[in-house]
Amino acid sequence: FGNPFAYTVDPLWPVDLRQPNLQLPWSSDETWYYTGGPHGGWAAGSAWAALDFAPPSDQLGCVQSESWVTAMADGIVTRSDFGAVVVDLDLPGQPADGFAGTGWAITYMHLETRDRIAAGTPVQTGDRLGHPSCEGGFSNGTHLHVARTYNGRWVAADGAVAFNMAGWLSQGLGSEYDGLLVRGTISREACVCRDEINAISP
């Protein structure tokens, strides 16, 4: 297998790590709902890298949605299966190499098979990736689970490099799934509901 140390990335995280500009992962003419604060990026025990959002709907549970999940930044789709779409980000000075384990990548979970973008597809900010659903992992309601990785490691949504989507900054409240999104003087709290308290607009 050769020398494993020849493949190391040092440092794994630079001390001045900054998140690239990310947009909200849905159309600019829609309001979605913040239903889950910082929680495991991938199953129980993983870093609290993920946030959850539900599309606009009058229905509850696992129902088909015509809303689209859209790319938060330019990149290349490296995975599209089992409800997951992973996009390796294309950044100035750090172009996408097609590997989610290097640089920044975004994982979008619970995307329906119908209309889901294919692996290998280049995307630009705002391009359609698929529809939110209950596919891929446990879910009892149609939603999007979104998380960031850097060099293959989950980046905590409320850590030193807080999740920032179009100026909405993630703040944890100490318990899994509890959290705020704050933009300027506006604050929204995670809630398993669709209400003004958790409504997020571009």
Regions found by a protein language model. Give the residues of each.
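Zn2+-dependent peptidoglycan hydrolase active-site motif and core
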Residues: 64-116, 140-143
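A structural signal for short beta-strand/turn segments enriched in small hydrophobics and glycine
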Residues: 34, 69-71, 75-77, 120-132
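Acidic, glycine-rich catalytic/binding loops that coordinate metals and/or anionic ligands
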Residues: 1-11, 15-22, 63, 70, ...
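Short glycine/serine/proline-enriched coil/turn segments at secondary-structure junctions
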Residues: 42-45, 78, 136-140
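Active-site-proximal beta-strand/loop segments in catalytic clefts of secreted hydrolases
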Residues: 36-39, 53-56, 73-74, 80-81, ...
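Extracytoplasmic
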Residues: 19-21, 29, 46-50, 72, ...
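Short glycine/threonine/proline-enriched tight-turn/helix- or strand-capping micro-motif at secondary-structure
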Residues: 32-73
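Small beta-barrel nucleic-acid-binding modules, principally OB-folds
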Residues: 44-61, 93-99, 104-106, 111-112, ...
